[in-house]
Amino acid sequence: MTRKIIPSAFIDRVPNYSFNINKLVYEFKTYLEQFIEDVNDGRNKVLVQRKFHLYKHNTYQYNEVDTIPYTAEIIKQITDIFTFDSVNYRYIMPNTAYNWHVDTGANCLHIPLITNEGCWFVYQNRSISMPADGSLYTVNNGKPHTFVNAGTEPRLHLTFEILD
């Protein structure tokens, strides 16, 4: 039986979860990075985000799931516990910030894979950093927020989202 993602005031670490970031990054870089696409929603004049839907509405968007066994194991582990219907890789490009927005799903889960000290989620006078240390985070998307990558390298997160 699955449950809704744990509500968060802003961003919280989900206890008792730890993932091997090196394995996740290896599988992404080796098999999936080639599929990532630019996101241009018309609100930004520069490229801020690149994204790949790995899993959407209970279906993999990638046909060779056997090449990413560790990632597939994590998706199964999380879907056995939490309700969500989309898994994405999201690059946030260096020296960029997104617009203020509220997402459709109230909360989502993030596993930071590649980050730097210039990467921040920003809410009403509050900035929060999520290190790529193997942790799972719940992020409140129902409050106005943005994200910033003031570093020189792209930031990469694996995200689990509710689309409705």
Predicted regions and their residues:
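A short hydrophobic beta-strand segment most commonly corresponding to one strand
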Residues: 107-112, 136-138, 152-164
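Histidine-centered metal-chelating micro-motifs
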Residues: 97, 118-119, 137, 142-148
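A short beta-strand-loop-beta hairpin characteristic of the jelly-roll/cupin
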Residues: 114-132
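Non-heme Fe(II)/2-oxoglutarate
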Residues: 1-81
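Conserved SAM-binding loop
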Residues: 128, 133, 140-142, 147, ...
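Short glycine/proline-enriched turns and hinge-like loops at secondary-structure junctions
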Residues: 102-104, 123-124, 149-152
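A short glycine-rich, His/Asp/Glu-containing loop-to-beta-strand
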Residues: 75-94
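Short, conserved beta-strand element in jelly-roll/cupin
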Residues: 91-93, 102-119
